[in-house]
Design a protein with these regions (language model features):
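Helix-loop-helix
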Residues: 1-229
Length: 229
C-alpha cells in the first residue's frame, strides 16, 4: 500500500487514533475467521453508529435552518439595499429562534478525524494489504472493476437519497462524484473502496429514514435509538 507502518510511538495521531483502530480491525478479523473484509464492515458499522447522534444533531440544525428560510428571504428583500442591517436582523432572528447557523458544521468537524483515522488504519495495516477477501487482494486494486462499480453505484444512491436536502447546483454533483469515486477506486488498494461501499450503504439506509418518505417517523425512531444518547 506504500504507506508508512503504524507506529504508536511516532506521535499523538498514530498513538491515540490510528493504532487503536488498527488493533480493533486486527481483533475483529481474528474473531471473524481471519476475514479482514468482514472486520472492516464491523468497524465501519460501529463507528457510523457511534456518530449517529452527531448526524441527528446535524439534521435537526439543517431542518431548523430550512424552516427559517421564508423569514430570511423576507429580511433579504426588506433590507436589500442595506447589507449591514440585513445581517443584523438575520442574526437577531437566529438569536430569537435559538438557532446557531454554524451548529451543523460542528458534528462534521468532529467526525472527520475519526473517519480519517479509520482510513489510515486500513491503508497502513500490513496484515490487511496481504489479505484476500472474496475475489480481491485487499492491498491491490480490483482487477475486475467490480468494487469500483459498487463504490460508484453506492455513492450515486447516497447522493440520490439525500438530493432533496440540497440545492440545484449541488444536485449536479451527484453525477460527478460517482465518476470520481470510480476512477479513484480503480487505482486504490481494494481495502479502501470496500470501506467506501460499506460506509455508503450505511449512509443510504440512514438517509432513507432521515430524509426519505417516512421522514418524520424515521427521525423519531432514530432519535429514540441513538439521537438522544
Amino acid at each position: 500500500m506504500h504507506k508508512a507502518p503504524i507506529d504508536p510511538n511516532s506521535g499523538i495521531w498514530d498513538k491515540y487514533f490510528v493504532y487503536p483502530l488498527a488493533m480493533t480491525l486486527d481483533w475483529f478479523a481474528e474473531h471473524l475467521w481471519g476475514q479482514y473484509g468482514l472486520s472492516i464492515l464491523v468497524v465501519t458499522l460501529i463507528i457510523r453508529s457511534l456518530i449517529l447522534p452527531l448526524t441527528m444533531k446535524q439534521y435537526r440544525s439543517s431542518k431548523r435552518m430550512q424552516e427559517l428560510q421564508p423569514e430570511i428571504r423576507k429580511l433579504k428583500e426588506k433590507y436589500k439595499n442595506d447589507a449591514k442591517k440585513q445581517q443584523e436582523e438575520t442574526m437577531k432572528l437566529f438569536q430569537q429562534q435559538g438557532v446557531n447557523p454554524l451548529a451543523g458544521c460542528f458534528p462534521l468537524l468532529i467526525q472527520m478525524p475519526v473517519l480519517i483515522a479509520l482510513y489510515n488504519a486500513i491503508m497502513r495495516n500490513q496484515m490487511i494489504s496481504e489479505h484476500t477477501f472474496l475475489w480481491m487482494q485487499l492491498g491491490s486494486p480490483d482487477p475486475y472493476y467490480i468494487l469500483p462499480l459498487l463504490a460508484a453505484a453506492t455513492t450515486f444512491l447516497q447522493q440520490k437519497v439525500m438530493s432533496t436536502q440540497v440545492n440545484a447546483q449541488m444536485k449536479n454533483l451527484m453525477y460527478i462524484f460517482p465518476v470520481l469515486i470510480f476512477v479513484m477506486a480503480m487505482n486504490f488498494a481494494s481495502a479502501l473502496p470496500l470501506y467506501w461501499v460499506y460506509s455508503n450503504a450505511f449512509t443510504v439506509v440512514q438517509s432513507y429514514f432521515i430524509y426519505g418518505g417516512s421522514r418524520n417517523k424515521g427521525v423519531q425512531k432514530l432519535e429514540k435509538s441513538g439521537g438522544n444518547r
